[in-house]
Structures are given as structure tokens and as C-alpha cells.
A protein has these predicted regions:
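Active-site-proximal segments of metallohydrolase catalytic domains
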Residues: 247-323
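Active-site recognition of the HExxH zinc-binding catalytic motif
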Residues: 337-354
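Short pre-active-site segment immediately N-terminal to the catalytic Zn-binding motif
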Residues: 223, 320-341
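Fold-level signature of zinc-dependent metallopeptidase catalytic domains
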Residues: 175-239, 252-262
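Beta-strand-enriched, solvent-exposed domains that form extended recognition/catalytic surfaces
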Residues: 50-178
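Bacterial Sec-dependent N-terminal signal peptides
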Residues: 1-47
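Solvent-exposed loop/turn segments at secondary-structure junctions
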Residues: 215-218, 256-260, 314-318, 334-336, ...
Length: 478
């Protein structure tokens, strides 16, 4: 074989190799696509086997004191369309302080799991709860079952022990389940993460976030819609939300109030508003919250939603966030953006407060129990938290670095030092309102102070994980 034939042979062999590699890559991609499609289809089939594409609303009252919890069923209603997840239905991403489980009545098989926390359970940590019984109402949306189901409500204490439980049966054909046909209030989408061919938002592939007007009169509704756009801009200006914006829909719900602004009890000001929010919750001036979840869900009847932000028409600092319950924030305070993002971290991803006091009334995170919040640890089971993110040879507890006092920052260089502290992962003592025995993952974070821009890496991962969970198109962790 001469040199020319040799070069021709090598070139032919090389081309065959390239073609074979390309073919193998194509087969691999087709196989992966087929597996993804089968998993997505399997998820849809699992949902369709047990549920219809509608919503069942369940209303309860939770009552008790600092050591007792009871749950009482009130009523049920149903609405067209289901805005929640259709995959990973029986999985529990976070334990929360309570769990709602739907099980098939005939077989006992778990069909759907929803975890949550409530204002009632926060109240149990107050001094008032040691001397009086109180009741709070809650509502839950679940997919409408095709057949008879058992509903199990479980309430846990600070040790994770079950202290309250209710089980009852729901028959979807029950004539006393009220059918809600149309939305009761005007609403407008201010952001659509994904749209269908008809231009409507895709409520199956996206997380549906409802912003409800509170303390806005009829003449202030255009201000409300403008404020809602500010909410969208503020929330998605922060990572990891910026990168996940296409996985959210945001709908503005124009709930009209007779009076402008919320109630302020310590000033003797009581208003007539759509949701009934007020400052001074649990006698804390800044704690702005509503006690009436039934009323809030009534306003949202017929509107697809999974998470709620109550936007309060006020320039006074305040707000609150409770896991899988609601976020409350004010519209016009100078720190509106920071408060919104912090409180939404609580409500959406179950992130705990990373600040602490030396005189906390109640130990909410006892040493013998690992917190369920992903960004707090008592070291009881640190391996389940951010141990995998800890740099090698990091001491536990991690000594804090010398950084500027966030209350005295004046220069850009000092602000950069503070923000840099959010990205150093360690095990810093102090968190969950307790100065001792509870540890947080970063020296500073959006869940600790308002003066930094970023979530720490541990909180960011938690936000991404919960978003992946809600928007998953298949039924596997992998």
C-alpha cells in the first residue's frame, strides 16, 4: 500500500469512527429522552389513577395551649383545576410542624402528602399559651380524589413528637362538598413563567404564587398592581430565584378593602380590610399577620395558587412568613424588598430564622432534636444537613471572622465584606432565636440580617431543592 492509499485508508477509518461515535451519542440521547418521557408519563398516570384535575379545599380549626393541640374538621369545597404538583405526590420534602396525608380508604396506600406550619403552633411558644386556650383556623388545598380517602392531620411539638391528630374520611361524591365555579375576585397575571399554546399560564409545570391585596381601597387598585410588579422585580432579583424565574407564575388578586392600610392595635387603630391583618401579633409591634385563613382562602376561591403573599398597603415595617401557610409583607417601607425575600424564604422553603437573642422565652429548638428547617442544626443529626458542603477541616463550632458590624456599615468595601461572609460555609453558633445550642451555616445571610444581598449556599440549595420538588415531571428523587 503506497502512502496515498494509506492516507485514504486512515481517512476512511477516521470517518467511520466519527460516524460510529455520533450514532452512539444519538442512541444515548434518544434512550435518555425515552426514559424521561416514560417517567413523566408514569407520574401523570399515577396522578390520573387517583385524582381528577380539580382542587379539594379542606378547612380546619386548630386549638389548644402550650402543651396540647387538637384539630377539628369544619367543611370542604371543590374547584375546577389543580394548580399543585402532579408528581412525587406521597413524598415529604420537609417535615414541618404538621403533616396532612391522604390515603386510599380501601387499601390504606398513601396518595398525597402535604407538610406545613401554622400561626397556632408559633403561638404555643408564647407566654400567653401557658395560661389560656386559643383556636386558630387553617385551610389546605389538595387534589380532588376519585374515590373515598382517609385524611390524617398530624401535629408535632418542638421535639418532633406527635401531640395532636385527627383522622376523618372524605367522599368526593358528598353532596355537602360545595362546588365553587368561578373566581370571586378580579385577578391579573403579572408574571407567567411558562405559557400554553392559548397564551394562558401553565399551572402544571410552574409554581403558582398569588399576591393578595390587603388594605387597598377600590381607588387604590392600580397602585396594587404596580406594587405587585415591584414584588416580582424584588423577588427575582435575588439568586437562586433569578435563575428559576421561568418556573413561577405570579397572579395579582384584587381584594378590595373598605379602609386603606392595616390595623395597628398599639395605636388604637382598627381597620376594615380584606384579610384582617394587624400589627402586634403576639404583642410584637412588627409582627404583621392575619389569623383568618378561611377568609383568605375564600378570597382566592377559583384562582389557581399554591403559595400566598399578602401584600399590605403600608409604609410601616412589618411582616411574617410561615412554612406552606403564607407570607405577609408591606408595600412601601424602605426595606420592603429585603423583608419580602426573607419572609418568603420562611414560607416557601421552610428556612428558619438565623438571628438569635440572649433572652428567648421558649426553647424552640431543644438539644435532643434535630430541627426540620434545612438551615438550622443542633448537631443531633448534622449529617442530614450541610455536612456535605462543609470545607475540609472546618472547626465545629466555626469561629466567626472579623467583619464589619452590619448596623454601622458606611462604605461599599464594608458592604462587600458583609456579602462575602454569606458565602463562607461553616457551623456558626446562634440561630433559631437561641444564642446557644443552635447553629447556622453562614456568619451572615438573608435569613439573619437585611443588610446583605445574598442567601448563603445552604439556603440557596434548599430553595433550589424545594423548587425542583414542586416542578418535577417524574416520581423519582434521581
Amino acid at each position: 500500500m503506497d502512502s496515498r492509499d494509506s492516507r485514504k485508508y486512515c481517512l476512511t477509518l477516521h470517518m467511520k469512527t466519527i460516524i460510529n461515535v455520533k450514532w452512539r451519542m444519538k442512541k444515548l440521547l434518544l434512550t435518555l429522552l425515552a426514559v424521561w418521557c416514560m417517567r413523566a408519563t408514569a407520574g401523570a398516570q399515577a396522578f390520573d389513577e387517583h385524582f381528577v384535575d380539580s382542587t379539594l379545599r379542606l378547612d380546619y380549626v386548630l386549638a389548644g395551649n402550650n402543651h396540647e393541640q387538637q384539630a377539628y374538621f369544619c367543611k370542604a369545597s371543590k374547584m375546577s383545576r389543580w394548580a399543585g404538583r402532579k408528581n412525587r405526590l406521597a413524598e415529604m420534602p420537609l417535615k414541618g410542624n404538621g403533616q396532612l396525608i391522604l390515603s386510599d380508604h380501601a387499601t390504606g396506600r398513601q396518595l398525597y402528602v402535604h407538610t406545613f406550619s401554622t400561626l397556632f403552633q408559633e403561638w404555643q411558644a408564647t407566654e400567653e399559651a401557658t395560661r389560656v386556650n386559643r383556636a386558630f383556623n387553617v385551610s389546605f388545598n389538595v387534589p380532588l380524589p376519585k374515590h373515598l380517602v382517609d385524611v390524617n392531620i398530624t401535629l408535632t411539638d418542638f421535639h418532633g413528637k406527635v401531640v395532636g391528630q385527627l383522622q376523618h374520611t372524605v367522599n368526593p361524591a358528598d353532596i355537602l362538598i360545595r362546588q365553587v365555579k368561578e373566581p370571586q375576585l378580579p385577578f391579573r397575571y403579572v408574571w407567567k413563567g411558562q405559557v400554553q399554546s392559548d397564551g394562558e399560564p401553565d399551572i402544571t409545570r410552574c409554581i403558582d404564587l398569588a399576591i393578595v391585596a390587603e388594605g387597598y381601597t377600590d381607588s387604590q387598585m392600580e397602585k396594587f398592581y404596580t406594587d405587585c410588579q415591584r414584588v416580582v422585580d424584588a423577588l427575582f432579583a435575588h439568586e437562586p430565584f433569578t435563575s428559576m424565574k421561568s418556573r413561577f407564575n405570579v397572579v395579582a388578586v384584587a381584594a378590595e378593602s373598605a379602609d386603606s392600610g392595616p390595623s395597628i392595635p398599639h395605636l388604637g387603630r382598627w381597620q376594615s380590610t380584606a384579610v384582617g391583618t394587624h400589627y402586634d401579633t403576639f404583642y410584637s409591634n412588627r409582627y404583621l399577620m392575619t389569623h383568618d385563613m378561611h377568609r383568605l382562602y375564600d378570597l382566592l376561591a377559583g384562582i389557581p395558587f399554591e403559595h400566598i403573599i399578602v401584600l399590605v398597603n403600608s409604609d410601616i415595617y412589618g411582616g411574617g412568613g410561615i412554612y406552606n401557610h403564607l407570607t405577609v409583607t408591606t408595600s412601601d417601607h424602605p426595606m420592603f424588598r429585603q423583608v419580602l425575600v426573607h419572609e418568603f424564604g420562611h414560607a416557601y422553603a421552610g428556612l428558619g430564622d438565623e438571628y438569635f437573642y440572649d433572652d428567648s422565652y421558649e426553647t424552640m429548638y431543644p438539644a435532643d432534636t434535630e430541627p426540620w428547617e434545612p438551615n438550622l442544626t443542633t448537631l443531633k443529626d448534622f449529617g442530614s444537613k450541610w455536612a456535605d458542603m462543609l470545607p475540609k477541616d472546618t472547626p465545629i463550632p466555626t469561629p466567626p471572622a472579623k467583619i464589619p458590624d452590619y448596623r454601622k456599615v458606611k462604605t461599599e468595601a464594608e458592604r462587600q465584606q458583609l456579602n462575602a461572609a454569606t458565602q463562607r460555609v461553616g457551623v456558626f453558633e446562634g440561630g433559631g432565636y437561641q444564642s446557644k445550642g443552635v447553629y447556622r451555616p453562614a456568619q451572615e445571610c438573608r435569613m439573619k440580617i437585611n443588610e446583605v444581598e445574598n442567601f448563603c449556599p445552604v439556603c440557596s440549595r434548599a430553595l433550589v431543592r424545594i423548587t425542583d420538588f414542586y416542578t418535577s415531571q417524574h416520581n423519582s428523587h434521581k
